[in-house]
Every structure is written in C-alpha cells, then in structure tokens.
Amino acid sequence: MENNNSLTIIKKADPKTKSNGEAFQIAFDSMDKIKTMLTQQNDKEKLVLKKLMIEMSINNSLLNELLTSFSTRVNIIDVEIIVLESQISTIERLTLENKKEIQSNDQEKIKEISSMIDKLIDPLLKNIDGLTNKFTEKNVNDEELKKKIDVFFENSKKLFQGIDKAEKSQFLTKFSSLFGVISGFLGIGSVTAIGATEAVGVTSLIAVGATSLSVVAPICAPVLLTFGCLVGAFISFYKQSVARDKKLKTLKSLLSYYMENIELISQVTDETTKLIYHELKEKVLEFKKLEANLKIDFDLSPIKDQFKSITSKQNLIKDKVEEIANYQLDLIQECQKLKKKSLKNKTINKK
C-alpha cells in the first residue's frame, strides 16, 4: 500500500492508541486558523481573505460529493457486515457445539467439523474481498469527482504561481522606494513605486496599489532636512512592503490548509477502509490456518471485535466529514456577510 501522509496519519489513529480522531484533527485545526484569520483581520484584509474563500467555495460542494459517495458505500458495507457477522456466529456456534468431540480427538468427527468450518470460512473470505472491492471500486461518479478534485488542485497551483509573482513584485516596490530616496536627494525628479496586481487562475488574488513618491529637492532647502524626509518616506514604503509580504504568506498558508483538507478527506476514507479489511482478512486467514491444525480453542471474539472496530471507524469518519462540511459552510456564510458589508460600504461611499 502506498505510504503517503494520509496513511501515516491513519496508522497513528490505530485503535491501540488513545484516540481514533487524529486523522481529522489536522483539518479542524486548519479550519480554526481560517476562522481566526476572518475575525482578527481588519476590513481590508478580511476582503482579501473573503475573495479567496468565495472562490474556494467549490470545496464545500466537493466535500458534499465526497460525503455522499462515502455514505453510499457505507450503506452497502453495513448490509455486508450483517451477513458476515451471521457467518461468524454460525462458525462460532458450530465449533462450540462440537468442542467435546474435537477435544476427544475423534478424527472422523474432527474431519467432518473442519470441512463444515472450511465451507463457512471460504465464503467469509470471499465476502471480505467483495466488501473491499465494493468500497474501492471506481464508477462514473467517482471518476467525475476525481476530475473535480484534479481541477481544484490545478487551480490551486495557478493561485500559488500568482502569489509567487506578487511576492517577487515586492522587490520592485522596495527597489523603487530606495531609488526614490537617491533621486530625490540628488534633486533629479520624481519616481513612482510600482504596485503589483495579480489575477491568476480562479481568483483575483491581491492588488497592491500604486504609490507615488514625488520629491524635488528645493535649491534653498537644507540638504539634511531633505534627506531626512526622504529616508522617512523610504522607511514607510519598506514597512508597507513588509506588511504585503506577510499578507501574501498568510494567503499562501490559507490555500495550503484547503489543499491539505481536500487531499486528506478524499484519501482517508478509502485508505482507512483498506487498512481495516486487510487486517480483518489476515485475522480470518490466521484463524483458518490454526483451525486446520486444531491448535486453537475456536475463539472468534477477535474477529467479532474487528467488525465492531470497522463500524465505529466508519461512523467516526462519516461524522467528521459531515462536521467539516458544515464548518466549511459556516466559513462561506461568514464570507458572504463580509461581501454584503463591503457592497453596503461602497454604496454609502458613492453617496
């Protein structure tokens, strides 16, 4: 099985550890950070975040599709589990009813019982394989969903490229500010610090306004005063540039959270289920091998416990995905409120 980050997270969330919810803690932590960003930024910064959030609202429908796809599979698995539990109960009853004959070493009886158990175990193994296939098989809807996820990642890459370009443009702003100090000091005219506007991929990422620095050194003005004013202007421009750098890094971080969440949710259900059924099959095969050699007391409780683990993990995943989807919806609604507030402010300003 492919060893990726999601699978590593799932293995950490093994039933042997204290918590089964570790796989989704990353998603919740990142969502908390997003909400904090929305509540702590000033209005202009909120609008920048709002634009990105609105453009990424496709995530919500993506999450819902993932949830629907998973729920459909879970319903199929629930039915199959009932059948498997029935088979296990039959094997358990058969072994208990014939325990005395087995212990008495009645070879004919043992052979007869082993044959009956084999006839029950073989379909059990087949059903486990079928169960895994039903959960992981690809259908038309899955392929469409995969295409949407691929488009999301492609758009995200374009956004990152836009952020990188905007970050590089900060160098121009700093350089032009420095050049403004020098040219102003020499009294040779004025210079404009050029801002950067990036519109790449699915969103207009960030617009850095154009700021003009016009300094003409008066012939009669003291040189020292002129230089002091220019240095002050340069410091102001530099601070603005640093603030923009910080904002761009915040946006890049926010986009990373989204990408991690979608990747985690789209992989964690399949990978978790594969892991569970692989362990289950190993236990049944081990049981069959020991049963053939009559070296165990026909205790099927570990396998039954494994089914309980499957059910609880399925419910955990389902609940967490629903919770994340609702959380995402709350964030989008908060962004829409910001958008309405922005439009209202624009209307007031026009008046």
From Swiss-Prot:
Keywords: Glycoprotein, Membrane, Transmembrane, Transmembrane helix. The chain crosses the membrane at residues 175-195, 215-235. GO terms for cellular component: membrane. It is found in: Membrane. The keyword Metal-binding does not apply. Disulfide bonds: none annotated. Glycans are attached at N4, N59, N345. It comes from the Eukaryota. This is Transmembrane protein DDB_G0272716.
